[in-house]
């Protein structure tokens, strides 16, 4: 693959290991099981999927778009690297100036395959167990917001209510590995998580009554996430390879 060092690239439809580092795109098919097997047997792997910013939009298919690439995780977990702001700033996204102080705890489940991969449970079980845990700590109202899906596709472009609008009365967002975590901190909403694969926080549910939000921290996290996603040109040039820290 152009821009990717280390010899030949194999597309392993038969899932037979042929050496080198494995790379998985999304959780299509049995990728969630393959990642677990690969991690146990062969070590380091890469994961690519939708980006944190600059997502491909089917309504504007010719626009430049990005894809996140993460090493040994479905998300960038080293979120306090103090990366420069240039890549994030080019998107023109404004970080909220103050915290949203609403009432609702909003659960944002990931896909069923994602929950199986990062939490060894189904989406339904995650929702039920998370609600049960939260209710032992607080009596705040809880609402589940599923990822928008319509006409065989998913994502922000098919949402009936934009996420930023839907969290205007949020106290916090609870997620495992959902991309909604990123949009939450951009909009001034704190996040707590149930896994170590969350792209913006490591705070668990036990911290839910003390959770807070800081604009400078949100901006620094977004700066790092913008350095964890790449255009096709940046993959061809070798920039993505270098930024992924592959040795």
Regions found by a protein language model. Give the residues of each.
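Secretory-pathway glycan-assembly enzymes, especially type II membrane glycosyltransferases
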Residues: 1-91
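Active-site regions of enzymes building and remodeling cell-envelope glycoconjugates
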Residues: 6-10, 18-23, 37-46, 61-67, ...
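Donor nucleotide-activated moiety binding/catalytic core segment of transferases
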Residues: 12-15, 135-191, 196-197
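Redox-cofactor binding/interface segments in oxidoreductases and associated redox assembly factors
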Residues: 23-24, 107, 175
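Short, solvent-exposed loop/turn segments at secondary-structure junctions
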Residues: 27-30, 51-54, 110-114, 148-151, ...
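Short amphipathic alpha-helices and their capping/turn segments at secondary-structure boundaries
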Residues: 37-40, 91-102, 132-136
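Leloir-type glycosyltransferase catalytic cores
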Residues: 57-102, 201-247
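Conserved catalytic-core segment of nucleotide-activated headgroup transferases in glycan assembly
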Residues: 100-151
């Amino acid at each position: 693959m152009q821009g990717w060092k280390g010899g030949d690239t194999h597309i392993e439809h038969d899932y037979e290991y042929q050496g080198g580092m494995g790379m998985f795109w999304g959780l299509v098919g049995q990728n969630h099981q393959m990642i677990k097997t690969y991690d146990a047997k062969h070590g380091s792997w890469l994961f690519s999927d939708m980006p944190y910013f600059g997502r491909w939009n089917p309504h504007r298919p010719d626009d430049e778009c990005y894809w996140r690439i993460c090493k040994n995780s479905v998300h960038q977990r080293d979120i306090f690297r103090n990366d420069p702001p240039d890549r994030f700033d080019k998107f023109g996204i404004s970080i909220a100036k103050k915290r949203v102080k609403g009432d609702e705890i909003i659960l944002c489940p990931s896909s069923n395959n994602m929950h199986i991969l990062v939490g060894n449970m189904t989406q339904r079980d995650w929702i039920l167990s998370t609600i049960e845990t939260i209710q032992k700590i607080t009596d705040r109202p809880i609402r589940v917001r599923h990822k928008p899906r319509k006409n065989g596709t998913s994502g922000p472009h098919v949402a009936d209510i934009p996420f930023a609008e839907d969290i205007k009365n949020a106290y916090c967002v609870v997620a495992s590995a959902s991309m909604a975590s990123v949009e939450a901190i951009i909009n001034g909403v704190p996040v707590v998580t149930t896994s170590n694969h969350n792209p913006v926080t490591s705070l668990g549910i036990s911290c839910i009554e003390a959770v807070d939000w800081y604009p400078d921290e949100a901006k620094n996290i977004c700066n790092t996430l913008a350095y964890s996603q790449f255009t096709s040109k940046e993959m061809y040039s070798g920039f993505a390879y270098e930024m992924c820290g592959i040795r």
